[in-house]
């Protein structure tokens, strides 16, 4: 689990310039240095560990968690960790309706799958050169926008967001559907938009990497707990012995005989 040393080394304590702050983050601010707000890492550590446990427990219950982060500093790191633990992610651009109009998104994903099926079967080679080029361009665009959510069969139970100030549409859709939001909370962000905030720098690459790493580890730990629970439940469950029809009839006859003899 994250330590104070990790937070310091990754620059999690550096907020934004004082003129860019959101006054609602005042309770998370330790002070000011060269017109930069410094985040109170004691509070960050406490919120980090609490949120880690929340994410771990959600994962242990089999809940799905989506990663969202489209800005330049975050997109490759977020994709790396999301793919390593096989969770859905959006790292290029959030398409409106990704959550609130999920059925339409699924139709677009199906288009991507159909194009791939055409490639695998060789059917695409029967098209004209121009048609083939158009379809491959379509595939490239769909994969860029939807590649991270192509295996997502339902809306997620929770989303982890890098930079809630930038990902306004994603945050608004999640809130509309009452999907809990986990996010680092920089000094320019609104704490009221985040269910499980972690006060910290959401701009520095090392800080972003730390957040992604810890959330990924929480999810993996949760999955391990779920597997242990399943194994434990199986070990403690008694094997059910089913009575055959013949045995059932024989037993009923014996009971009937005992009742008759008792009546005499």
Swiss-Prot record:
Q: Which domain of life is it from?
A: Bacteria
One GO term under biological process is: translation
Which GO cellular component terms are attached?
cytosolic small ribosomal subunit
Tagged with keyword Transferase: no
A Pfam family it matches: Ribosomal_S2
KW Nucleus (keyword) present: no
Q: Which keywords, in A-to-Z order, does the entry hold?
A: Ribonucleoprotein, Ribosomal protein
What residues form the membrane-spanning segments? none
Q: Which SUPFAM superfamilies match?
A: Ribosomal protein S2
PROSITE patterns on file: RIBOSOMAL_S2_1 (PS00962), RIBOSOMAL_S2_2 (PS00963)
**Annotated disulfide bonds:** none
Return the InterPro entries for the record. Answer: Ribosomal_uS2, Ribosomal_uS2_bac/mit/plastid, Ribosomal_uS2_CS, Ribosomal_uS2_flav_dom_sf
Which Gene Ontology terms cover its molecular function?
structural constituent of ribosome
Q: Where is the signal peptide?
A: none
Can you tell me which family this protein belongs to? Belongs to the universal ribosomal protein uS2 family.
Q: What is the designated name of this protein?
A: Small ribosomal subunit protein uS2
Q: Which organism is it from?
A: Helicobacter pylori (strain ATCC 700392 / 26695) (Campylobacter pylori)
Gene coding for it: rpsB
């Amino acid at each position: 689990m994250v330590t104070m040393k990790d937070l310091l080394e990754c620059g999690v304590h550096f907020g934004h310039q004082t003129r860019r702050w959101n006054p609602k983050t005042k309770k998370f601010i330790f002070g000011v240095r060269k017109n930069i707000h410094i985040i109170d890492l004691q509070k960050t550590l406490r919120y980090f560990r609490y949120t880690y446990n929340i994410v771990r427990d959600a994962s242990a219950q089999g809940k799905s968690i989506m990663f969202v982060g489209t800005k330049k500093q975050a997109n490759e790191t977020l994709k790396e960790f999301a793919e390593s633990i096989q969770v859905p992610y959006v790292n290029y651009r959030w398409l409106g309706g990704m959550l609130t109009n999920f059925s339409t998104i699924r139709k677009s994903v199906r288009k991507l799958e159909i194009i791939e099926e055409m490639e695998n079967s060789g059917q695409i080679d029967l098209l004209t050169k121009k048609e083939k080029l158009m379809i491959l361009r379509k595939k490239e665009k769909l994969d860029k926008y939807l590649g991270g959510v192509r295996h997502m069969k339902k809306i997620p139970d929770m989303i982890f967001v890098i930079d809630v100030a930038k990902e306004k549409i994603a945050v608004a859709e999640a809130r509309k559907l009452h999907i809990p939001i986990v996010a680092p909370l920089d000094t320019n962000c609104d704490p009221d938009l985040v269910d499980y905030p972690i006060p910290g720098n959401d701009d520095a690459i090392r800080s972003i990497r730390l957040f992604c790493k810890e959330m990924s580890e929480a999810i993996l730990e949760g999955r391990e707990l779920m597997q242990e629970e399943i194994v434990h439940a199986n070990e403690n469950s008694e094997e059910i012995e089913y009575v055959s029809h013949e045995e059932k009839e024989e037993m009923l006859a014996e009971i009937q005989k005992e009742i008759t003899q008792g009546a005499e």
